[in-house]
A protein has these predicted regions:
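Short, solvent-exposed loop/hinge segments that bridge or flank secondary-structure elements
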Residues: 38-75
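N-terminal helix-cap/turn-to-beta initiation motif at the start of protein domains
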Residues: 26-40
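Residue-level signal for WD-repeat beta-propeller blades
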Residues: 33, 60, 67, 125-126
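Short, exposed beta-strand-loop hairpins at the edges of beta-sheets
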Residues: 121-143
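Contiguous, well-ordered beta-strand patches that form the walls/edges
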Residues: 45-47, 68-123
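C-terminal segment of classical bacterial N-terminal signal peptides
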Residues: 17-25
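Bacterial N-terminal signal peptides that target proteins for export
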Residues: 1-12
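Short, solvent-exposed mixed-charge patches
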Residues: 27, 148-150
Length: 150
């Protein structure tokens, strides 16, 4: 009987155990990864029937930044309270019509949209790396800034 087959099996078993333990402790995807980050407003899409900004004031916010973290939201340097980041799936046309007295047509949202509560406003998940942000009566397209490589 050779000593090496036993050692070989022991090495294989140890490796398999280590891989299983690593997989079990691997970081799970963050359920809020689709909303967390730094977002830049790129375009005014539409407005609600009642807005607290003029069209010119709304246009001046294009290029401004929305920062969404798990414990805070900041828009254009102004902080909101800690967000709940609660989300719900809604019929986009009905939700925008009833909640904002606006039409969904120009927003480019899917028929069923995920709405995320950011405390001081709401964001609508549009597509990967794109959201629609509602701010003081206006809807904006926003894109996520790429994360810096480490």
């Amino acid at each position: 009987m050779s000593f090496f087959p036993i050692v070989g099996r022991l090495v294989v078993m140890t490796t398999l155990f280590a891989m299983a333990a690593h997989t079990a402790h691997a970081k799970k995807p963050d359920k809020d990864a689709d909303i967390l980050g730094i977002w830049t407003l790129t375009k005014v899409l539409d407005s609600a029937d009642i807005a607290s900004l003029t069209d010119q004031q709304a246009a001046a916010l294009v290029g401004k930044v929305l920062v969404v973290r798990r414990d805070s939201v900041m828009f254009n340097g102004d902080p909101c309270r800690a967000p709940g980041l609660t989300r719900r799936r809604q019929d986009a046309a009905k939700y925008v019509r009833e909640g904002y007295h606006a039409r969904v047509g120009g927003l480019g949202l899917p028929d069923i949209v995920t709405v995320v509560d950011l405390d001081c406003t709401e964001a609508f998940l549009k597509e990967r790396e794109k959201i629609v942000v509602f701010w003081q009566g206006y809807f904006y397209d926003a894109v996520r800034r790429p994360q810096a490589k480490r």
